[in-house]
Regions:
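Signature of the first transmembrane helix
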Residues: 10-68, 105, 134, 251-273
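Interfacial/gating helices of multi-pass transporter permease domains
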Residues: 36-57, 122, 188-196, 244-249, ...
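Membrane-proximal transmembrane or re-entrant/amphipathic helices at the cytosolic face
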Residues: 486-556
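N-terminal membrane topogenesis motif
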Residues: 1-28, 84, 88, 233-261, ...
Length: 556
């Protein structure tokens, strides 16, 4: 493979690394939420989600978007060999999160009673537990962004896995510990203290991830020093100028990300307020919202994480080629990113809808809400495609310096989202379905507006057949066959083993077999229909092995 082709496919290779990490961390996230939900219940999940949504918004405002900003600014400076300035940006970013993160943590802790909806006071102590995490998250983000700018996603990927493992272990352990230590057997207190313990796991995970990144940085310190020493450009910038660059870059990115994600807080606030207006008990409203955010939202975010990985991985490559005015190469990166994302996201959405019941039965088998959880997952699974595409296009626009455009698009989408959601909640009895429909509408609008903007500012025209039509056709066929296959294998195995194997274990076995069947069917179809080339397949995790298998099976 030529040097040029190697460089062009590097973004996919790096995205694959992040994608694997994203899959692993999301799977861990889903798996640990299952025992946590069994411990704290849907009501506890509701308090946890309310607090986490507020925490996330404050994190976005203070420092969450700093990795993207650091990655973009540092990679742009490195593209023109200004290594001294690149390292100065890194140091200034650390000072930035020290100040801003500290202030945000204090505001969160002391202002929790104001930030939490007035009819959900039990979520206040959960938010206070999360407050210190904001401070440490900023530092973790700076280190991740710095390594991403160096076109290596391995440190970020490993730190994400380490963080999530620590989060999972501490969340489960602390939830049990808090309940036994503080609830005193009171059923009304169990959801609150359980949610507090689960929230403590987030902080433990972030601190563990930060310690890991500090270790990796110390191991590479000599390399960074040599990099600075070989800077012979003679160009330098004052710390004042660099802080201004960071501020000018971070502010619109933060605003864009904030508006892009604030829909969860808006949804939460509208849902709680309107359900309260309809005289629904606060505990019931919290339980319902726990189903939406703690089950449905957790599950659809697994495939969306793949788009986040692609967006994160491609920003340095897009930013670097755009800085060098190599627009053709830049458009090539965009084309690869969107195609790669759709090949994964479309079957994930269809497959999740087809296997909604066994997924819920295995992970969240609470009998009181399982039918509702299955129904909203089947209804809203299509939003995975829209969120994935809007996330990638958001990253493209930020990578080419149009950071205000996603902000505008998100703001327009949010306003129309609220216009739809409010009457659906007020004048119908859709309840959670109103949230599902409104979030689907919001994701679709973001997807549409962002892609129109990419076309306008980059002159990019999307290829449709290989990117959308073939994956969609393959996924629909796969979904139908997978659903029938699951029903058949469950009928057979339950007849043979049903009398001495627990239902949940039996469903899990059938689910795993069905997922394997679905993956094989999808990739056979998409390869036969020429939706993926050999070169593209090599960029998947274990790509060379997949190519050998495809050739042996005469699919390539």
């Amino acid at each position: 493979m030529s040097s040029k082709n190697t460089k062009e496919t590097n973004v996919l290779a790096q995205a694959s690394i992040l994608m694997v990490a994203g899959i692993v961390t999301r799977i861990i996230g889903v798996l640990y939420r299952s025992p946590v939900t069994s411990i704290i219940g849907d009501e506890g999940n509701g308090y946890y989600s309310i607090a986490v949504n507020i925490y996330t918004m404050i994190l976005l405002i203070s420092s969450y978007s700093i990795p993207m900003a650091v990655s973009k600014v540092v990679s742009a400076k490195m593209a023109v060999h200004q290594y001294k300035i690149a390292h100065k940006v890194f140091k200034c970013a650390l000072i930035y999160v020290l100040v801003i993160g500290g202030i945000a943590s204090l505001i969160t802790f002391f202002g929790a009673s104001v930030l939490i909806p007035s009819n959900q006071p039990k979520a206040i102590p959960v938010l206070r537990i999360l407050a210190p995490t904001i401070f440490f998250s900023g530092f973790l983000g700076v280190f991740r962004g710095y390594f991403q700018a160096h076109r290596t996603m391995i440190p970020t990927s490993l730190s994400q896995i380490v963080e999530q493992v620590a989060n999972a272990v501490i969340s489960i352990g602390a939830a049990v510990l808090f309940i036994h230590a503080f609830a005193g057997g009171d059923a009304d207190k169990i959801p609150v203290f359980g949610a507090m313990g689960s929230a403590a796991g987030i902080g433990a995970g972030v601190i563990t991830g930060l310690l890991f990144m500090l270790f990796i940085y110390s191991c590479n310190k000599k390399y960074f020093k040599k990099e600075i020493q070989k800077d012979d450009t003679g160009v330098d910038s004052s710390y004042k100028d660099i802080f201004r660059i960071i501020f000018m870059m971070v502010t619109p990115v933060i605003l864009s990300t904030f508006v892009y994600n604030i829909s969860t807080v808006v949804d939460q606030t509208l849902f709680m307020d309107i359900m309260g207006f309809k005289r629904m008990a606060s505990e019931t409203a919290a339980s319902l919202y726990g189903v939406f955010s703690g089950k449905y939202w957790v599950l659809i975010n697994v495939p969306i994480a793949l788009a986040n990985s692609m967006s994160t991985a491609m920003i340095p490559a897009i930013s670097g080629s755009y800085e060098l005015k190599d627009y053709k190469k830049c458009r090539g990166h965009v084309r690869q990113a969107i195609h790669f994302t759709m090949v994964i996201s479309i079957p994930a959405a269809i497959g999740m809808g087809a296997l909604a019941y066994p997924i819920m039965e295995v992970l969240f088998p609470q009998k009181a809400t399982i039918d509702l959880a299955v129904s909203i997952l089947r209804t809203g699974c299509i939003s995975i495609i829209f969120y994935a595409l809007s996330t990638v296009s958001n990253g493209v626009l930020q990578g080419i310096g149009k950071v205000n455009i996603p902000l505008r698009n998100a703001a327009v989408s949010l306003v129309l989202h609220v216009v739809l959601l409010t009457p659906l909640l007020y004048f119908t009895n859709l309840n959670l379905y109103a949230l599902v429909f409104a979030t689907m509408f919001y994701a679709f609008l973001m997807c549409l507006l962002n892609n129109l903007s990419v076309r306008k500012y980059l002159g990019y025209h999307q290829e449709m057949k290989r990117t959308f039509m073939i994956p969609l056709l393959s996924s629909v066929i796969m979904g139908i066959l997978c659903y029938v296959f699951y029903q058949g294998i469950y009928l057979i195995l339950s007849g043979i083993f049903g009398s001495f194997i627990h239902l949940r274990i039996l469903v899990f076995i059938c689910l795993m077999i069905s997922v394997g069947f679905a993956v094989i069917v999808y990739f056979v179809l998409v390869l036969k229909l020429k939706g993926i080339t050999e070169a593209e397949l090599r960029n998947f995790p274990k790509g060379n092995m997949l190519v050998r298998m495809a050739k042996k099976s005469k699919l390539l």
